[in-house]
Amino acid sequence: MNKKKALHITPHFGGGVGSVLMSLVLNLHKRDDFEQEIVSLEYANEKAKNWSNANGIKIYDKVSPVDNRLHEKMQNRDVVHIHFWNHPLLYQLLYSFSGRKTRVVIWSHVNGHYAPYLFNDAILNFPEIFVTTTNFSLTQKDITKRNSDWKSRHIRSIPSCSGLNEFDKIEPVPHDTFNIGYTGTVDYCKIHPDFIEMFNKADIPNVQYIIVGGDSHKSMEEEARVKGCINKLKFTGKVSNVKEYLAEFDVFAYPLQRENYGTGEQVLIEAMCAGIPQVVFADGPEEYVVQDGITGFVANSKKEFIEAIQKLYSNDSLRRKMSAASKKYAKENFTIDRPVKSWLKIYQELLSRPKSECIFRKFESTEDLAVSLFLLALGECDASSIYKEILQYYPDDVPLELSEKAARLPQIFNGNTRGSIKHYSSFFDNEKLKYLEIFGTLQ
């Protein structure tokens, strides 16, 4: 039997999405239906390369998005599975491949509601099928404006989940303090801005907050020191084995800022598998994962969030009940078999359709491609309006008021990655992007 060929394309291969991708591809690889291979436009980290060698799955990394050999590979494969988030190399690939025929499915690893990770018509129209990782994404404005026939043909939703991965086998480790834990991105681009203040306000004796992850843990640690609560908080930075820390958590507190880009929230699933009650805000994908009052609490305010933590501290029987419910719910809903079956169904659906022309947004010959891709990916938001206004002054100075507006933008727009100006400027040698970069350094 000749296997059909599926080609996965990802901006880079590593981190949280990398773990989900490895689990999915490996389990698809074990089936007889499709041969799997992966192209990473940027890097594949050592963990991914070791995984590739151990399992006989080909990885090609540092592949140029404009390389004709990649375009030919995409045209020759039966299914092209693109893993989406705002990354300059991915946008460059979609633009440069436009006009060619293949069968594309895009799986979004961002929820699409907030800049710089907004969905847009160019992204939604490019594939034959667009797959979200959370039902929260189905309420995004560029999806809801489409008619029901279009959505029925082109929109699907499959949770981002790497399976139980023995997180359900974690046994609690005895400890002397009441441990409230967080794992994941430690950066205000994702975490609630009052993260430290909320923990400090919770009236819990003998408490230890264990914050696992990076990359801004050092600056947040210094903030806790300045606020006089460093004795309550332990920042670990990135760790190689998160299970060791989950074994010591009594409660999993996951307060994200409202406009975060998350989707499947794999760390929530891991906590649930381990039987740790979860506390989240009623914003975005988190409330689609946590079963309010059953596996944990979904809070509508900072006050409710703190009260939920205090309630779990003071009620041992409730914690045990929610722990058991969490394990049960995870085993029923988050095994890897479910997404594997869903993906095979989508692959078969794609095979039933002929290869079609992929059309991306066209730009005028007078438009600057790098800047146009950056602004397209950024979408309709305050940052985009400010940058467009600044560019009207290029290459001269801009009014002070406009500079100050740029300086007041959230940190995510001025970071080194995540679709920021610096991110695009690092891949495109472009004077206008370098000009815009100046205003990100004024914060």
Mark where each language-model region is.
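Short hydrophobic beta-strand element within catalytic cores of glycosyltransferases
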Residues: 40, 273, 277-280
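A short, active-site helix/loop in glycosyltransferases that binds the activated sugar's phosphate group
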Residues: 115-121, 125-155, 162-164
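Conserved donor-binding/catalytic core segment of Leloir-type glycosyltransferases
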Residues: 7-9, 160, 166, 172-190, ...
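C-terminal amphipathic helix plus adjacent low-complexity
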Residues: 332, 337-443
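Glycosyltransferase donor-sugar binding loop
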Residues: 38-45, 183, 208-221
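Nucleotide-activated donor-binding/catalytic signature segment of Leloir-type glycosyltransferases, i.e.
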Residues: 56-58, 221-239
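Conserved acidic donor-binding segment of nucleotide-sugar-dependent glycosyltransferases
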Residues: 292-303, 311-316
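Nucleotide-sugar-dependent
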Residues: 255-269, 281-288
